[in-house]
Amino acid sequence: MSGRPGSALEGLPFGRTAQVARFEELMFGTVRLEELAEQARRETRKNFGKTMRLFAPLYLSNECVNTCQYCGFSKDNPIRRVTLQPAEVEAEARHLAGTGFRSVLLVSGEHPREVPVAYMAECVRRTVPLFPSVAIEVAPLEVDEYRQVVEAGAEGLVLYQESYDRAAYAEMHVSGPKRNFDERLLGPERGYAAGFRRIGVGVLIGLADWRKELVALAGHISHLMKVCWRAQVTLALPRLRPAAGGFQPRVAMSDRDFVRAVCAFRVAFPQVGIVLSTREPAKLRNGLMELGVTMMSAGSETEPGGYTGVGKARLHRTVRGREVALEAGEWERAEATEQFEISDDRSAKELSGALRQRGLDPVWKDWDRALTA
């Protein structure tokens, strides 16, 4: 690992706090990884006990109006697309609930016509009876739009900045509303104003210098902990995975540096939740179970209809945003295109077993709406 990053916070609306300085020292200083890992283990046990919250993503649509170089859903990719109907979303949700999940993340590409706010709210209403905890990961919205989703029953908002490097962000987001860096950056605060009780932010490793990205993420977290002080703040640092379009990471982050980053965030931000998705391999996820991670996904499908096959009859292909019918018979053997390839394909049951082997308790439900009714 090379030295400390330069001006990672330049041009961002938050500064270098004591917590950010602490993170930098842990991440780029002289402390040995083994020592840092032990500190992270102690802080995790102290603040979160022996628990691991489990959740599953549920994709609503892979339609998108943005052209993003790295994303499988990018408008320019000629992929198979579909937007699930609310009843189909409910069918996917019932399947996940039947496997034990009580926390779900509703995910969608950005397409105002195919995925309007009213549709999102209806999908939330369909899933709320099955899941005590419903979160959304969709395009940035305005406060009144977020409020509609909160009133429908959603309690969590996930909005990753992708990259905090303005130049890299502009290069990666070629066209579409996602090009607006600041609109996205301020989205979590608008979500908080609308009433979300859990706010998740993150950076996609592979788009720019990951050292600067991590410091900027630390700055964002420190800022949100002050301005969104009633909410639980969570973070994630997913690494790029293969996806339609074939984009290759601009910079790689080793497993050792990834582990160090998780541990450094845990020690510098002891009460912040850390999310680890199925992008990472099973062996690495196993190793991080006790070192700072507090939320894990399992058995994930990253395409709409991936759990039950619903919506298959309406599959179509798009070429630069224009809809093209599938070839005769193609839909019978095809599925919607996934956003990215997962690495850890273990089921929820298998992941629960791995957690218990390490003395950890899988938590399917950790909140109920009656607590705030």
Residue ranges: model-predicted function:
Residues 40, 68, 106, 159, ...:
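Conserved, mostly hydrophobic/aromatic
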Residues 42, 46-88:
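Canonical Radical SAM [4Fe-4S] cluster-binding loop centered on the CxxxCxxC motif
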Residues 75-91, 96-192, 198-201, 205-207, ...:
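Core AdoMet radical
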Residues 142-151, 208-223, 281-291:
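Catalytic cores of alpha/beta
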Residues 56, 93, 120-124, 146, ...:
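Generic structural signal for well-ordered alpha-helices
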Residues 1-34, 225-373:
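Auxiliary Fe-S-binding modules of radical SAM enzymes
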Residues 62, 110-114, 205-210, 243-244, ...:
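Short, small-residue-enriched loops and turns at beta-alpha junctions
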